[in-house]
């Protein structure tokens, strides 16, 4: 989901 997307960028 959107949260996992941002976690992937980190």
Curated annotation (Swiss-Prot):
The keyword Phosphoprotein does not apply. Its main location: secreted. InterPro entries: Tachy_Neuro_lke_CS. It is found in: Secreted. It comes from the Eukaryota. The modification Methionine amide is found at residue 10. Keywords: Amidation, Neuropeptide, Secreted. GO terms for biological process: neuropeptide signaling pathway. One of its GO terms (cellular component) is extracellular region. Disulfide bonds: none annotated. Tachykinins are active peptides which excite neurons, evoke behavioral responses, are potent vasodilators and secretagogues, and contract (directly or indirectly) many smooth muscles. Belongs to the tachykinin family. This is Neurokinin-B.
